[in-house]
Amino acid sequence: MYTTQDIAAIRTQVRQWKRAGETVAFVPTMGNLHQGHITLVTEALKRADHVVVSIFVNPMQFGQNEDLDAYPRTLAADQAALEAAGAELLFTPTPAIIYPKGMDKQTFVEVPGLSEELCGASRPGHFRGVATIVCKLFNIVQPDVALFGKKDFQQLMVIKAMVEDLSLPIEIVGVDTIRESSGLAMSSRNGYLSEAQKQQAAQLKRTLDEMAEAIAKGQAIPNVVRHAQEQLHQAGFKPDYLSVRNAADLREAQDSDKQLVILAAAFMGSTRLIDNLSFERA
């Protein structure tokens, strides 16, 4: 696997592959990789001839008082895991390479509506940062297909909307969430949790499962949400939001909607965890 910070080197290699009629898949990450990321690479290998991965802790998507400086940087371990998984090209730019004029003078991409609620309401500017860096990386790598985890469901929807709105010739693939044996969704931020907190945090997925079952049986969504919030409080969480949405467009769920998704964000101690569950209502 070849690792570079150089935009020109990435473009040269991708151009060579495409001239040979070969396809390119892309997996953007912030590093500190876990099995969920490796699964994205494995899936990417099924969909293209070559896999490019990026590692960039994007300062534009972190708000004030968030964990930018504390976010783990584990490049050597990440490189070893990616090489073992079959990635061929790793792009590891610095903020100065990505934002040479500084973030305040950087052209940005913003997806209206989707970016402003749920995680967007709790983290203003977050999805502007996500959309901007993903669009920029797409322009650098020029992939045929890009893969993202469904754990970040709202992010996946924002990226799909951006690609559609800007007519980018890239297929966006969502990959199912990879979980610990307890049910806790794998996340780089799980490393902030103590072992006891990890066991407590598994209640988040159990709560989502119980909500989906109750809604599928016809219970009123507001009542289900209220009960679930009480459950999370009792389990030691401080809920940020808990919302049932149409899975296709993230509108508030209507009685006629069949394909639904429950989205949740909650703090366990000082660590903010997110999860979601898609299900069908009869």
From Swiss-Prot:
It is found in: Cytoplasm. The keyword NADP does not apply. GO terms for molecular function: ATP binding; pantoate-beta-alanine ligase activity. The active site is at H37 (proton donor). Keywords: ATP-binding, Cytoplasm, Ligase, Nucleotide-binding, Pantothenate biosynthesis. The keyword Ligase applies. One of its GO terms (biological process) is pantothenate biosynthetic process. (R)-pantoate binds at Q61, Q155. GO terms for cellular component: cytosol. ATP binds at residues 30-37, 149-152, 178, 186-189. Its main location: cytoplasm. InterPro entries: Cyt_trans-like, Pantoate_ligase, Pantoate_ligase_C, Rossmann-like_a/b/a_fold. Signal peptide: none annotated. Its EC number is 6.3.2.1. Pathway: Cofactor biosynthesis; (R)-pantothenate biosynthesis; (R)-pantothenate from (R)-pantoate and beta-alanine: step 1/1. It catalyses: (R)-pantoate + beta-alanine + ATP = (R)-pantothenate + AMP + diphosphate + H(+). Beta-alanine binds at Q61. The reaction proceeds by a bi uni uni bi ping pong mechanism. Homodimer. Belongs to the pantothenate synthetase family. NCBIfam families: cyt_tran_rel (TIGR00125), panC (TIGR00018). Catalyzes the condensation of pantoate with beta-alanine in an ATP-dependent reaction via a pantoyl-adenylate intermediate. This is Pantothenate synthetase.
